């Protein structure tokens, strides 16, 4: 079953993450603002692969279920469209979604459960449409982003805010011994109108949801990819 495979893969990745956290903690302080992190290593942001192929080639398989749903929904061309930015969810974000859906259903019927198989059976049209939430029809590398954030239209025509904010959080790479203050990309999805002078850091519900990017500035042959963190819930489900 797809659901069992997803659970097994996620558990393996959780164990891997725990084992590598200490190493990552000592490596992250050297992050440069124009780089991006994959597994704690600095890489040149230029990637000689399409967005789809880069996600599919991830050595830890953190996009396996995402890629499967993209294939089944027939939206490969959407994320490979030339000149876009894709804020990519991970398999963890899909897991968070099916868990949240299950909890909501079980308030009515404790025996009900929502799974990845349920998504394949019932939600591929929704997935095909909602993937547009994560696409901005222009390239947004880190050097074009601002601390207070800028509003853009996503591919569904809805407002999103993308910002590039400094952090003093040691868990996000800050080290008081370093002269370089790390910066983090945030992707904020808006449910309500936002004034032009409101900084992205002030966005809260019910106005919108801020989602931190865990891997930023990946510049593929077709566009830019910013990978959302593993606590995100697919479709901004709430």
Model-derived regions, located:
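Sec-dependent bacterial lipoprotein signal peptides
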Residues: 1-31
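Mature, structured domains of secreted/extracytosolic soluble proteins
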Residues: 16, 29-238
């Amino acid at each position: 079953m797809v659901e069992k495979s997803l659970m097994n893969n996620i558990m393996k990745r959780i164990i891997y993450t725990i084992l590598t956290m200490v190493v990552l903690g000592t490596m992250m302080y050297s992050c440069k603002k124009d780089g991006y992190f994959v597994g704690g290593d600095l890489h040149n942001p230029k990637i000689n692969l399409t967005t789809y192929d880069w996600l599919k080639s991830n050595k830890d398989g953190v996009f396996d279920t995402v890629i499967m749903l993209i294939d089944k929904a027939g939206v490969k061309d959407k994320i490979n469209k030339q000149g876009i930015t894709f804020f990519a969810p991970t398999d963890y974000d899909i897991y968070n979604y099916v868990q949240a859906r299950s909890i909501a259903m079980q308030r009515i019927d404790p025996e009900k459960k929502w799974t990845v198989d349920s998504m394949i059976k019932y939600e591929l049209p929704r997935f095909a449409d909602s993937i547009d939430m994560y696409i901005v029809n222009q390239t947004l590398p880190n050097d074009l982003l601002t601390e207070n954030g800028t509003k853009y239209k996503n591919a569904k025509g809805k407002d999103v805010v993308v910002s590039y904010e400094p952090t003093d959080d040691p868990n996000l790479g800050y080290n008081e011994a370093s002269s370089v203050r790390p910066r983090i990309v945030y992707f904020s999805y808006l449910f309500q109108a936002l004034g032009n002078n409101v900084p992205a850091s002030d966005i809260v519900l019910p106005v919108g949801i801020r989602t931190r990017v865990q891997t930023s500035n990946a510049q593929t042959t077709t566009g830019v990819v910013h990978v959302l963190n593993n606590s995100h819930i697919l479709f901004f489900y709430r």
